[in-house]
Amino acid sequence: MELEQSFIALIEQSIKTNWYLNALTDYKGITLQYRDVARKIEKIHILLENAGIEKGDKIAICGRNSAHWTVTYLAVITYGAVVVPILHEFKADQVHNIVNHSEARLLFVGDQIWENLNEAAMPHLEGIIELKDFEIGRASCR
């Protein structure tokens, strides 16, 4: 438990110390400053809280490496939930199996992957959120 708190404190200190500096950049895409990262983490924390996510619940992330993927990862672990990272190269049936086997409650997903997924194949999933803008995807939270 102490390691977890130390890690979260390190992230918080890094954000506070570097508030106006660039933190994450997508290749030929967006650049987020540390303050942007903090604000997005806070918004995801609110989303997780409103979805009834509790410490230890599993949250799956499937998407290409990006600033938003990283923000989502940081938000989930600092919230106290467990990240289930899924490679974006996996086929839809593999993603379905991992989501189901892990008992993930939510799935953050890149739009390229979402197009190939079948919500009905993940019956226990409570919601799908798009990584590009953190909006509730075509599947809404139950």
Locations of regions flagged by a protein language model:
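Hydrophobic/aromatic residues within well-ordered alpha-helical segments
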Residues: 7, 14, 40-41, 121
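Flexible, low-complexity linker/hinge segments
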Residues: 1-5, 135-142
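Conserved AMP-binding/adenylate-forming core of the ANL superfamily
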Residues: 3, 12, 20-74, 91-96
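Structural core segment of the AMP-binding/adenylate-forming
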Residues: 10, 50-51, 78-140
